[in-house]
């Protein structure tokens, strides 16, 4: 299985500042030139919301303050500027190989 290691496990960021969450895969998640790494946001009592797919593409209705980057094994989610509504859990997710796997999550809070 592809193991996804997320860091940090928790993060506190001031409003208007930048939050950076990293995800490292145990092997490349690139398939035919496409990075099959995605990012989700989850709030208590709600299903996960797709933020970023294919490493850097924003999902439908996702604000421009969310961006993704990376390739191969190393990926990042950046939120800038941080807003109150962004306090949530964030997960990376790979779909290159079955079983699809998730990172352990990052608990992002307002500082």
Swiss-Prot record:
Q: Which GO terms describe its cellular component?
A: immunoglobulin complex
At the top level, the lineage of the source is Eukaryota
Region span, Complementarity-determining-3: 93-101
Q: Where is this region: Framework-4?
A: 102-111
Residue span of region Framework-3:
61-92
Q: Which Pfam families match?
A: V-set
Renumbered residue ranges of the record's region Complementarity-determining-2: 54-60
Q: List the disulfide bonds.
A: 23-92
From the UniProt entry, list the residue stretches annotated as the region Framework-2: 39-53
UniProt region (Complementarity-determining-1), positions on chain: 24-38
Can you cite a GO biological process for this protein?
A: adaptive immune response
- Key words of the record: Adaptive immunity, Disulfide bond, Immunity, Immunoglobulin
Q: What is this protein called?
A: Ig kappa chain V-III region PC 2413
């Amino acid at each position: 299985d592809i193991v996804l290691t997320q860091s940090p496990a928790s993060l506190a960021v001031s409003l208007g500042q930048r939050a950076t969450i990293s995800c490292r895969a145990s092997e490349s998640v690139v398939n035919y030139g496409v990075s099959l790494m995605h990012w989700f946001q989850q709030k208590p009592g709600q299903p996960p919301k797709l933020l970023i797919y294919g490493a850097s593409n924003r999902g439908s209705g996702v604000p421009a303050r969310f961006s993704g980057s990376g390739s191969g094994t190393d990926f990042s989610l950046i939120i800038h500027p941080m807003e109150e509504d962004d306090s949530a859990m964030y997960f990376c997710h790979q779909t290159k190989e079955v079983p699809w796997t998730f990172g352990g999550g990052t608990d992002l809070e307002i500082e």
